[in-house]
Design a protein with these regions (language model features):
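Hydrophobic face of amphipathic alpha-helices that form TPR/SEL1-like repeat modules
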Residues: 66-74, 97-106, 132-141, 166-173, ...
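Terminal, low-structured helical/coil segments at or just beyond the last alpha-helical repeat
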Residues: 178-205
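Hydrophobic/aromatic packing residues within the alpha-helices of TPR/SEL1-like helical repeat arrays
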Residues: 53-54, 85, 121, 152, ...
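Short helix-capping/linker turns of helical repeat alpha-solenoids
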Residues: 45, 57-62, 72, 90-94, ...
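Classical Sec-dependent N-terminal signal peptides that target proteins to the secretory pathway
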Residues: 1-25
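N-terminal leader/linker segments that initiate helical-solenoid repeat arrays
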Residues: 22-71
Length: 205
């Protein structure tokens, strides 16, 4: 059984992560593909079997922790989700930042904290297309459209489906940037092709 820790310890732990400055993700980029391949071996149509398999390898596999945390979040077990995400983050899995940001954005098991959300996403925007996609909305809200489109393009090029859809909409009218129907159709065609989804690849669903 996964042992839960206190909220105060959680806050301190996350603060340490965020105060550590710009992380060097080079080592993680070397080991994470192998961890992902191992975690993918647990995928099964029998979801209980799949979760049990993740649980068995979670002590040494950050993607197993991430997916167990996501399952806990979907079942509204936010405290467990938070702890598992923190374990995965401590292990160097930067893909969990987006999920932590979601908890803080919605106040799931923690107090809402927009500053923490932005810091979590900014930390990994250059290595995690999902984080880049989510962060783009912050720049859209600030009307910094150049940065927003740059983030969306990075995400879309890496098959983050919602980013492809958003770019298609952006290029279909001149509200944000000049209309480019060719690009709009291009991104919509990629969005409609569901054969390769980056989010599904990372989250397992």
């Amino acid at each position: 059984m996964f042992k839960l820790v206190t909220s105060s310890f959680t806050a301190i732990t996350l603060s340490i992560f965020l105060l550590s400055g710009c992380a060097d993700h080079s080592e993680a980029l070397k080991v994470l593909p192998n961890e992902l391949a191992i975690a993918d071996q647990c995928k099964n149509t029998n979801k209980k079997y799949e979760m049990d398999c993740y649980d068995l390898i979670s002590y040494k596999n950050s993607f197993a922790q991430l997916r167990l945390g996501l399952n806990a979040q979907l079942n509204e077990n936010y405290n467990e989700a938070l702890q598992r995400y923190l374990v995965a983050k401590e292990s160097g899995n930067f893909y969990v930042n987006s999920l932590l940001a979601e908890l803080y954005n919605n106040g799931f098991g923690v107090e809402k904290n927009e500053e923490t959300v932005i810091k979590l996403l900014e930390e990994v925007k250059d290595v995690d297309p999902i984080a880049a996609y989510k962060l783009s909305y912050n720049y859209l809200a600030k009307q910094d459209y150049k940065k927003a489109v740059k983030l969306l393009t990075y995400a879309a090029e890496n098959n983050v489906k919602p980013a492809q859809s958003e770019l298609s909409k952006i290029y279909s009218n001149s509200e944000i940037i000049d209309t480019d129907l060719e690009k709009s159709i291009y991104w919509n065609d990629l969005y409609q092709d569901k054969s390769d989804s980056f989010m599904k690849r990372i989250y397992g669903k």
